[in-house]
Amino acid sequence: MPRTATRKFMGTFFHNRVSSRKYPFFGSVECTRRCNSRCTFCPIGNERPEFKKGEMDTEQFCRILDQFAGFDIIAVSFLGGEPTLRKDLPELGRHCKKVGLLSQVSTNGITLADNADEYTKALDVLVVSLDTLDPEKYKNIRGVDKYDQVVSGVKEAVKVAGANKCAILVNTVICSANIDEIPSVVKYAKELGTDGIMLDFATFHDYWTTMTAQGSRYDPKSMDWRNRAAEVKKLVPMLIEMRKKYPILTSKSYLKTFLTGDFHYRCHPYLFCCVNKTGEISVPCYDSSITKFYSLLDGSRRLKDFWFSPEVISARRQVKDCTTCYMHCIVEPSKVLGEPLRNMGDLLGWIGTFQKHGRV
């Protein structure tokens, strides 16, 4: 009998607590850097064309997924750009089921209404971006007039998700433009019948501005939530309290980071295995000043061997005290899984989530 996601999670957790050979829990693959939005807090939809060239074909993508499965990775996130612009996305989701991986897709939801049944049959978790309840503000933040279309997509997905055994989540990016609305978005996510909401403070790196095209809408200076830091400190305790009544999946430990402003945490990049759109693994993580990329498709290395190489282990050690990043996908796992005794409540919450949605 195949192991469930919960058993995989617990097995990896206990192994990593006692062994120096640390295994990743999660994988992520950048499906594409193409995007049909032009968000003011994200550079990808605003990039110059040269950064969008080259993507794995279906066969290559499945080879990456096979390596993830062979390494006992529990779940894979399909990221972008906008993953639904890949016509083979459902096929990739079905391959995940075949090899025993949970699949999660982060999408802007623009194509969801017309594809809800197909997506929810193929994938385990759909995470749909919704940052505001104001259509005009949505247009200003996301650069496209698609608010009604996205909400319709969420509703259609919720209708079929139960029968298709797929969890529907909302993801809200917190930036200076929507801080006042966050509690209302949380409440609306529950009204829509979704399985939960994730809250993600917008991340900005200085070098991202060097990648944007002429006419870019990327505006980190005005969209930075730190412009309204005093209001963030009022918002965070409110969200922590709302977790008692609303399905906020974001951990207390992540939220408290933005209450205290203390980003001097121990980074654990071994928790996540990140692969870009051409099949290269990023070492030690996706966005450090020393990150290098290595192909997993050219036959020169296998993930399972390369992960424990001296080169990779050394790179991870160099960023263990990194304080230049507050990306959700790094901060939260590093706190919950890297400091479990301090964040036991969050760890138990994660285990509960796997028990609820871990169908593999």
Model-derived features with residue positions:
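Conserved alpha-helical substructure of the radical SAM core
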Residues: 2-118, 124-125, 136, 205, ...
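Radical SAM enzyme [4Fe-4S]-AdoMet core and its adjacent flexible, acidic
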Residues: 4, 8, 99-102, 122-282, ...
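Flexible mid-to-C-terminal extensions adjoining Fe-S/redox cofactors in radical SAM and related proteins
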Residues: 10-14, 18-19, 262-264, 280-360
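Structured loop/turn residues at beta-strand edges in well-structured enzyme cores
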Residues: 22, 71, 121, 192, ...
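Short, solvent-exposed beta-strand edge segments and adjacent coil->beta transition regions
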Residues: 24-26, 169, 322, 326
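Short, intrinsically disordered, charge-biased short linear motifs at domain edges
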Residues: 25-26, 250-255, 274, 305-316
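Short, flexible helix/strand-to-coil boundary loops that buttress conserved ligand/catalytic motifs
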Residues: 43, 116, 142, 285, ...
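Conserved residues at the C-terminal ends of beta-strands
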Residues: 45, 79, 129, 200, ...
